């Protein structure tokens, strides 16, 4: 009897070893950059991050926590809302995340930060990514003044009219560091017909441009994701 029990336990153990692990999505933070921006009317800490699904199932960012610390390690600003631009990430896909917190004490300076992102398996939507072309135009003449813009040309390469197209654009330096993130959306009242293209234009705030100049950094390119979320039946 004992031998039979041992044989059964051994068989169960071997079966457990042989069973493949359940597929799961997994978030990996590839890059996170902290920017402190102070103007006459605000003092904020911005966090720009790039996140990739390195698992083997669809996943979405379900929550996030961002906290900023001063030189003594004391928390000075926080945010618990992660603006994850692409709702559902397929295996190997990435998205950008923006979080920010207000520094209420004007004497404090952001010296360090913590970012925590949580993901969950997502089967409610299918995120369709659309081809896009980007262009960076610095000091573009607007008549009697100039502006700095990121341009994203999006093409609907499907055979149907698409509503609620979203775009996120990341401003990058020579090394690919994220300098700024901005987004735009057609919302549900406007659409892009099959085979057609349209241009999104997003302004780079002058306070960020002044910060790059002070740090000796130069924006050189734009990376963009254009997508539409399609609810599954």
Protein language model annotation of sequence segments:
Residues 3-23:
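Sec-dependent N-terminal signal peptides of Gram-positive bacterial secreted proteins and lipoproteins
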Residues 41-48, 63, 144-151:
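Short, solvent-exposed loop/turn segments enriched in Ser/Thr/Gly
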Residues 51-56, 154-158:
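Asparagine-centered strand-capping/turn motif at beta-strand->loop junctions
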Residues 56-61, 75-76, 161-164, 178-179:
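Short acidic/proline- and small/hydrophobic-mixed sequence motifs that coincide with surface turns
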Residues 59, 64-68, 162, 168-171:
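Short, structured motif recognition centered on aromatic/hydrophobic residues
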Residues 68-78, 171-182:
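Short aromatic-acidic-glycine turn motif
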Residues 76-106, 181-210:
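Intrinsically disordered, low-complexity Pro/Gly/Ser/Thr-rich segments with frequent PxxP/GP/PP motifs
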Residues 102-146, 205-233:
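Terminal connector regions
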């Amino acid at each position: 009897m004992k031998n039979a029990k041992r044989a059964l336990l051994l068989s169960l153990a071997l079966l457990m070893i042989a069973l493949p692990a359940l597929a799961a999505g997994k978030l990996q933070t590839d890059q996170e950059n902290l920017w402190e921006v102070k103007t006459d009317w605000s003092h904020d800490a911005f966090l720009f991050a790039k996140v990739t699904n390195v698992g083997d199932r669809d996943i979405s960012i379900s929550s996030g926590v961002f906290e900023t610390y001063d030189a003594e390690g004391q928390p000075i600003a926080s945010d618990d809302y992660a603006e994850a631009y692409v709702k559902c990430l397929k295996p190997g896909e990435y998205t950008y995340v923006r979080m920010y917190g207000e520094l209420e004490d004007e004497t404090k300076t952001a010296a360090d930060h913590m970012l925590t992102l949580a993901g969950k398996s997502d089967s409610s939507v299918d995120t369709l990514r659309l081809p896009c072309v980007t262009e960076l135009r610095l000091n573009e003449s607007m008549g009697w003044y100039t502006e700095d813009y990121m341009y994203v040309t999006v093409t609907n390469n499907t055979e149907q009219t698409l509503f609620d197209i979203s775009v996120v654009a990341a401003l990058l330096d020579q090394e690919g560091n994220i300098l700024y993130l901005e987004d735009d959306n057609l919302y549900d009242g406007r659409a892009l017909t099959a085979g057609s293209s349209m241009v999104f234009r997003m302004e780079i705030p002058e306070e960020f441009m002044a910060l790059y100049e002070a740090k000796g950094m130069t924006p050189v390119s734009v990376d963009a994701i254009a997508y539409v979320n399609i609810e599954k039946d």
